[in-house]
Amino acid sequence: MDSYTSSDEDASRKENISDEGLNMLNASPEPMEEDDPEEQAEQEEETSRMARPIRSMRKRETTSGESMGDEDEDLEDEEDEDEEAEAREHHESGAHDTSFSNPLSNVDNLIHVGTEYQAIIQPTAEQLEKEPCRDQQIWAFPDEMNENRLTEYISEATGRYQLPIDRALFILNKQSNDFDAAMVQAMRRKEIHDDWTAEEISLFSTCFFHFGKRFKKIHAAMPQRSLSSIIQYYYNTKKVQNYKTMINVHLNETDTYDELFKEVNHLERVPSGYCENCNAKSDLLILNRVMSRHECKPCILYFRLMRVPRPASLRALTKRRQRVLCPEYMKIYVYGYLELMEPANGKAIKRLGIGKEKEEDDDIMVVDDCLLRKPSGPYIVEQSIEADPIDENTCRMTRCFDTPAALALIDNIKRKHHMCVPLVWRVKQTKCMEENEILNEEARQQMFRATMTYSRVPKGEIANWKKDMMALKGRFERFTPELDTTATNGNRSGKVRINYGWSPEEKKNAIRCFHWYKDNFELIAELMATKTVEQIKKFYMDNEKLILESIDTYRAELKSKLGK
């Protein structure tokens, strides 16, 4: 049984030997001539070389010791030792033979195993030479910096002002390591935080599950967020949330978005118009059967993907922008607006301080013949003799003629289809409407008074006054050439000679000028031409009482004429 197993193993080992080597082993040795010992030695060496792999494979087998006996192992060991000794002697004898040549890569056709066959390597240096650094140093920690002060600065900047550590150090470096100046700059800096709501985070996760890192498609599903904001949010949260577990799409294959896009292209559509969801003008509108309206393609894709309408704008979703803040300088007007929008209480005349109060008994009026009458119920007020019949909390009413029913009724009245003239129902009146009504009434009264005053003006006398003024103007224009021809008022040089005396005509003209211009001495002196400003002033001071009496008399005459 052992011999059978051994022969099988030998046969299996021979399979690893090439056909040429197997033929050389099985072939019988040819008879060699006695006078050629070198060829005989070479043939024996070749035979032993081809048989050596079989013996080495036997020695490496771990299971061969269990199947072979002790005698076979001893026999094989002796044969191996004899063959190795013969090969060593042959190698030593042929080392001095220069006629024998082999390839340089395999001189003796042996496997070089052992310390004597190892390559000789030069000893390496204990430490490599330092290569020049090609990086440019931007910042280095100063040796003289106080570490305790630095720790306090970072704690203050990151804890109180919510600045990142790298931002705080950047500010400190910009201020040349001056902690006080850096702290002042840190107080002025404000970090703009891009806060995401829970709904937006959930929507981003869903889109990332469908689209992967196709941020443009995610942006189409989240129009209220910019593309840079979406990318920044992804890189800020990729270390916290494991997005790799969400990806269910291959980049080179079609995804759900592409399939939806193909489906949308086959939906019912209409020509260009305005989207009923986002109110944006689009060249193509598609019918959304679920919402029963026409929407643009982005809104349709968003609805088919998320099953909710696409947000129209950032203002509609962001809570921070839903509430419009009123500027400080507008709060006064807002408070006044709220006050004026309160129901009217009938005290506008007292608030404005104009006009006269009058009693009104038409707060609520009902016309029986009016077809538009829709009373809400009887208006019953229980009151005593001392009580005010008008309730302060009752809203006053005003007429409204712009409703469709009122316009139709007025049209019927014009066509004489309605025989009665009804009173159109009134709407609630506010304080603002009440004050506007009082102001309009006061303006109408003032305009009426002005018209009546104008009608009482004596137009004929005013025309005569205009003629007198034109005559005085012409006289003044002709006054200078007339003075040149007289001997008292002119000289040879052509200049006007100032007369220091007052003639009766000059006194009369001066008093008339005082009637018109009162104490404008410069203008009066310019009109009279022969008197200086000092002379006019002196004349006024000497005759002030007489001049004032003449002015009062002149005004009284004007009032009496206007009163007629």
UniProtKB/Swiss-Prot annotation:
Residues 1-106 are annotated as: Disordered. Pfam families: ELM2, Myb_DNA-binding. GO terms for biological process: negative regulation of DNA-templated transcription; regulation of transcription by RNA polymerase II. Residues 31-45, 68-86 have a biased composition (Acidic residues). One of its GO terms (molecular function) is transcription corepressor activity. Residues 109-190 form the ELM2 domain. Probable corepressor protein acting as a component of a complex that represses transcription. May play a role, as part of a CoREST-like complex, together with the chromobox protein homologs hpl-1 and hpl-2, in the formation of the vulva and in fertility. Residues 191-242, 497-548 form the SANT domain. It comes from the Eukaryota. Keywords: Metal-binding, Nucleus, Repeat, Repressor, Transcription, Transcription regulation, Zinc, Zinc-finger. Belongs to the CoREST family. InterPro entries: ELM2_dom, Homeodomain-like_sf, SANT/Myb, SANT_dom, Trans_reg/Corepressor, Znf_GATA. One of its GO terms (cellular component) is transcription regulator complex. This is REST corepressor rcor-1. It is found in: Nucleus. A zinc finger (GATA-type) spans 275-299. May be a component of a CoREST-like complex. May interact with chromobox protein homolog hpl-1.
